[in-house]
Regions:
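A short alpha->loop->secondary-structure connector
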Residues: 19
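Conserved thiamine diphosphate
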Residues: 1-16, 172
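Thiamine diphosphate
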Residues: 16, 24-173
Length: 173
């Protein structure tokens, strides 16, 4: 989940569900994306935070906030971005990905994970099979990484609003 409000909704939903579940959260506090009064949540469905036309930014967990920041940066440069909060990767909301990506020019995923076998790989498969276009994954390197709090690590690897916006512009070029 991307913030405390979404985490609360997710836990409440899981308490009513008989299936096994796994939740991954960071240990550091994160800035809220949602509020008590505005936290759209549907089990196993991505949340559209912002609708745009040029590029789709798909984040999960702590990487949703940098996607929102990237969309704000891009908007100042005349680039319209959709932002999807993909809080759940299993099952993956393929319908939301296809709907968002179909008319966009490119897709950028952002995840606190290695570049292989995670959100980026799954989104690339869905987009490639249904609405082919460039997919760029912003992720940790497939190698040992530096240690530190989330912000320090994300900034070091360009996994922040500026870095995601730059990757989106490269994908659109």
């Amino acid at each position: 989940p991307s913030d405390r409000f979404q985490t609360k909704h997710l836990i409440e939903a899981l308490l009513k569900d008989e299936k096994p579940a796994y939740i991954r959260t960071g240990r550091n506090p994160v800035e809220d994306i949602y509020s008590e009064d505005n936290c759209p949540f549907e089990m196993d469905k991505a949340t559209v935070i912002k609708e745009g036309t040029d590029v789709v930014l798909i984040g999960c967990g702590e990487m949703v906030r940098p996607c929102v920041e990237a969309a704000e940066i891009l908007e100042k440069e005349g680039i319209s971005a959709t932002v999807l909060d993909m809080y759940c990767v299993k099952p993956l909301d393929t319908e939301a990905i296809i709907k968002a990506a179909t008319n966009a020019k490119a897709v950028v995923t952002a995840e606190e994970h290695a570049p292989f076998g995670g959100l980026g790989s799954m989104v690339a498969q869905v987009v490639g099979a249904n609405c082919p276009k460039k997919v760029v994954n912003v992720a940790l390197p497939d190698a040992p990484v530096i240690t530190g709090n989330s912000k320090a690590v994300f900034d070091y690897y360009g996994m922040n609003g500026e870095g995601i916006a730059a990757k989106a512009k490269e994908a659109l070029a």
